[in-house]
Amino acid sequence: MSTSVPQGHTWTQRVKKDDEEEDPLDQLISRSGCAASHFAVQECMAQHQDWRQCQPQVQAFKDCMSEQQARRQEELQRRQEQAGAHH
């Protein structure tokens, strides 16, 4: 009986066709300002095919998204306070 070795992920970027809509997740990441760090994670995964070797890139992306979420939350709170002050 032979043992098969599990293959790593095949991480590839799809090429966007002109008539194809952009993926909502890609849109979200682009709007977040974290596209460069997300791309770094994708590049690392394509090169190493092992997420454990990409932890610095994953952490940088996580930090970027956390900062973006905090800024968004602050902006929403500020808008709610302004709306409440006008009433």
Curated annotation (Swiss-Prot):
Residues 1-13 have a biased composition (Polar residues). InterPro entries: CHCH (IPR010625), Coa4-like (IPR039870). Induction: Up-regulated by estrogen. Belongs to the COA4 family. Residues 69-81 have a biased composition (Basic and acidic residues). Disulfide bonds join C34-C64, C44-C54. The keyword Mitochondrion applies. Putative COX assembly factor. GO terms for cellular component: mitochondrial intermembrane space; mitochondrion. It is found in: Mitochondrion. A motif (Cx9C motif 1) lies at residues 34-44. GO terms for biological process: mitochondrial cytochrome c oxidase assembly. The gene is COA4. A motif (Cx9C motif 2) lies at residues 54-64. Residues 1-25, 68-87 are annotated as: Disordered. It comes from Homo sapiens. This is Cytochrome c oxidase assembly factor 4 homolog, mitochondrial. Keywords: Disulfide bond, Mitochondrion. Residues 31-72 form the CHCH domain.
